[in-house]
Amino acid sequence: MQISLPALLSQLLLGLVNGSFYAILSLGLAVIFGLLNVINFAHGALFMMGAILSWMAMNYFGISYWVMLVAAPVIVGVFGVLIERLLLRWIYKLDHLYGLLLTLGLTLLIEGAFRSVYGVSGLGYDTPELLEGATDVGFMMLPNYRAWVVVASLVVCFATWYLIEKTRLGAYLRAGTENPRLVEAFGINVPLMVTLTYGFGVALAAFAGVLAAPVIQVTPLMGQNLIIVVFAVVVIGGMGSIMGSILTGLGLGIVEGLTKVFYPEASSTVVFLIMVVVLLVRPAGLFGKET
């Protein structure tokens, strides 16, 4: 089978775009699990919530994409803070299954609420005028918006990694997870820190949702299929591993894109095949710590 270079690079770019979404979403999951020890199944619904809030703001109030790129994560982050304070705080000392079931229930409620208003049909979201069109880079036409998605995702992902792994605040977050009493002895409000961490994690999902709105059809169910893949990404990278989630998300997006070129029939399952192999060889994940 002969594949032209532009076609190959186009699929590679598409894989990188999908990988960017995987990276941001899996990063949010890793932050929440690594620091709060909660499996947040509502992540896909909150990703969708960010996209639909952006669509609503644009269509009902004329608020631009750029404003919602900041506003939607803030709104969803505040919603996440309420979820953590009212619901999640009661299950931290229980088995992971309780958190999974609780967030699954939240997913059904959130998706059901939006589906009752908008149905399941796609909602059109125009590409921002500034990023319309494509740039000729010689060997292919590079869509401006897709290039923006990759750049924005990389900046957000590595800024988050730096914040958690290289700053004093990140050190407090990690220490608060392992020994909250010791951190509280230094005057740090650990419960507030935990609440804000969950809010930040779901804000990342909303940010990814706004980024995805012009690329992926906006529907109340848009997070369902994506979140299954993202959970696989987190497992492959290592539960709670920040850098593992970023690199694995980007890498698997590229692998998925190339699989669509050379063996399209396996493109929807290749991530899960890799997950099975990784779990057999290294159960803690590629970047996870063996216990």
Where are these regions (language model features)?
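Cytosolic-side transmembrane-helix boundaries in multi-pass membrane proteins
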Residues: 7, 86, 117, 178-185, ...
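Transmembrane alpha-helical segments in multi-pass inner-membrane proteins
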Residues: 22, 26, 62-74, 198-205, ...
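Membrane-interfacial amphipathic/re-entrant helices at transmembrane-helix boundaries
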Residues: 1-24, 53, 63-68, 94-98, ...
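Single transmembrane alpha-helix segments in multi-pass membrane proteins
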Residues: 7-58, 86-93, 97-98, 234-242
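Transmembrane helix-bundle core of multi-pass membrane transporters
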Residues: 90-166, 193-196, 217, 258, ...
